């Protein structure tokens, strides 16, 4: 699952992307148009790793939507 969000207002022009692959979640974010955006990789371990990764991704998506980001 890969989702892309943007937040734009008078002073901000940001993006945020989440990529869920099995037990790993990759978050990429920064100003729209920059060459090297920041990236965080979170790996989950254990029997429920895939489910934990899904819950984490859903939580982060809710957080960004609450802050005003729009899914593109």
Regions found by a protein language model. Give the residues of each.
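Short N-terminal "domain-start" leader segments
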Residues: 1-26
């Amino acid at each position: 699952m890969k989702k892309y969000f943007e937040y734009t207002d008078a002073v901000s022009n940001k993006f945020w992307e989440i990529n869920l692959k099995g037990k790993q979640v990759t978050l990429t974010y920064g100003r729209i148009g920059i060459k090297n955006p920041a990236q965080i990789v979170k790996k989950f371990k254990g029997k429920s790793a895939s489910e934990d990764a899904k819950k984490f991704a859903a939580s982060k998506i809710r957080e960004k939507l609450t802050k005003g980001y729009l899914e593109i």
